Amino acid sequence: MRHLIAAFLVAPLALAGAALAADGEYTLVIKDHKFHPATIEVPAGQKLVLIVDNQDPTAEEFESRDFKAEKIIGGGRSARVNVAPLKPGEYKFFGEFHMETAQGTLVAK
C-alpha cells in the first residue's frame, strides 16, 4: 500500500518535468502529426535547445516565426533546434507539413 501511495505522489512530479531533458534542453516528440507536449514552459532570458524527436514515419518541418526557427526532421529522426533567449511571453511553433494538427507553444516566464 505504501508503494501505491508513493507512486501517486511522485507521478505528477515526474510528468511535470517530462519535457526537460537536461539543463536548458527540452524534448518535443512528434507523434501522429502532433507535438507532445503541446506547451512547454521555459525560463525567460536563457538560451535553450529543443530536441525534436519525430516518431512519425514521414518528415516534418519544425518552424516558428515567433522565435525564428526552421528545420526539416526526417521520419524516425531527431534534431536539435537552438533558441535564443526569449522575453517573457508565448511563442508559437508548428509543423509546416501538418499545420492543421502540429501546433505548439513555448511559454517563457
Show which residues each predicted segment covers.
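Asparagine-centered strand-capping/turn motif at beta-strand->loop junctions
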Residues: 52-54
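Short beta-strand/loop motifs in extracellular/secreted proteins, especially
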Residues: 48, 58-60, 102-104
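Positively charged n-region of N-terminal signal peptides that target proteins for export
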Residues: 1-9
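N-terminal edge beta-strand
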Residues: 22-45
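Extracellular/periplasmic metallocenter environments
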Residues: 27, 74-109
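Beta-strand-rich interaction surfaces with strong enrichment in secreted/lumenal proteins
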Residues: 38-40, 68-72
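Sec/Tat signal peptide C-region and signal peptidase I cleavage site
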Residues: 15-21
